[in-house]
Amino acid sequence: MTGAEQLNSFLVDMFGRINKIEERTMAGGLGSAISITEIHIIEKIGAQGPVRMSEIAKSIGVTLATLTVACDKLVAKGLVRRVRSLEDRRVVNITLTAKGRAAYEYHKAFHERMIASVLDSLSPEQTAVLAQSLEKLQDFFRQEEAAMEGEEHG
């Protein structure tokens, strides 16, 4: 297997495992199933506070219709609530409930454990190389995403 094939195999496996483990970890912490999209919604709101529906949809790369369905599920699970803006009644913000805040903190702790487990075994030089490599991968994904958005609007 070439280096490129190994890297591809590693990335495909890693992305799949991260999603699967995140969903299972969160379900265990919440006591109910939760999708990766729902996790990302909670993460976005937890990091920023009350957020407009349209902003969340753009940030996590889903349509407003998809977000609405996911938010309906999160409301039913008691993790988020919809709040109309006092300044503009047309605007709906999504905010975390106390249970949603606990889910956000639980998810954040999972990520901290994941990163710590990697960094604990690397030298500062290896950490720098890993960060540079992941930054290049992130740049690729951003370029692909921008190209896709251009195709959708053009």
What spans do the regions from the language model cover?
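C-terminal regulatory/oligomerization modules of transcriptional regulators
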Residues: M1-T2, Q6, A128-G154
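Short capping segments at the starts of secondary-structure elements
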Residues: Q48-R52
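Charged, amphipathic alpha-helical coiled-coil/dimerization segments
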Residues: D72-V129
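Short helix-coil-helix linker/hinge
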Residues: G31-E38, T97, S123
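Pre-recognition alpha-helix immediately N-terminal to the DNA-recognition helix
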Residues: H40-E43, A102
